Amino acid sequence: VLIIAVLFLAACQLTTAETSSRGKQKHRALRSTDKNSRMTKRCTPAGDACDATTECCILFCNLATKECQVPAFP
């Protein structure tokens, strides 16, 4: 009787896990698509116009001149 009860509980957990993972799979796919779109955004090269929301390529946005610049190292 104990073996049957354990098997029944294991089967219930497996079906519950499978059902809930189906609903979450859609969200995971959307999340990975969003992540991929963020990863493929292009950065702005040196000398191009920028603002506080622009991503400059290994550079920084000089808000005074509003262009991407390479940082000056001493």
From Swiss-Prot:
Stretch forming the signal peptide: 1-17
Record localization: Secreted
Example of a GO cellular component annotation carried by this entry: extracellular region
Statement: the UniProt record of this protein carries the keyword Disulfide bond: yes
Tissue expression pattern: Expressed by the venom duct.
Single GO term (MF): ion channel inhibitor activity
Disulfide bonds: 43-57, 50-61, 56-68
Coiled-coil annotated spans: none
Annotated family: Belongs to the conotoxin O1 superfamily.
Name of the molecule in the record: Conotoxin AbVIJ
Region (Disordered): 19-42
Domain-level remarks: The presence of a 'disulfide through disulfide knot' structurally defines this protein as a knottin. The cysteine framework is VI/VII (C-C-CC-C-C).
Proregion span(s): 18-40
Keywords: Cleavage on pair of basic residues, Disulfide bond, Knottin, Secreted, Signal, Toxin
InterPro entries registered for this protein in UniProt: Conotoxin
Record carries keyword Secreted: yes
